[in-house]
């Protein structure tokens, strides 16, 4: 009996992470008094250079936690296509992470994998955690509605996406199942 209850609980929690329908993005219903922006953060590129995210002011950003050994890894191809097609509208930023135990061992391996298999040219950053107490500061901000004013959702798997407006404010969260080519996501980028 105890095993059945535990098995049902485990199955239910997995079902929440991998819903079969495409959930709508989370949009803000209330705003923090003074929400921060992603421009307040400095990150390290995949080759170790320090970058202030303020360098992307004036463009929408699609911030994605990525992994090389995931069922969603083929989304790299669509992310690259989106990055090229809407280069004047959005910049895709890829943040490799082993938070779900599906990333390669080093930044060098990740960069080589992305270039060889998907021709990735959009910016990739240092492999770092994206959830929990160990999450890198940017991802703590992205997941905390009291800080960003809009979204209170941490990545529950690889290839979750945060849309950031031209002023650096987080405006939407898209779970892994929402592909970069999803019409709703593309519409949000192009409006």
Model-based region annotation:
Residues 45, 65-69:
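Amphipathic alpha-helical repeat scaffolds
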Residues 59-61, 69, 73-95, 114-118:
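Conserved helix-turn-beta segment immediately C-terminal to the redox Cys motif
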Residues 109-158:
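Short, internal strand/loop/helix patches
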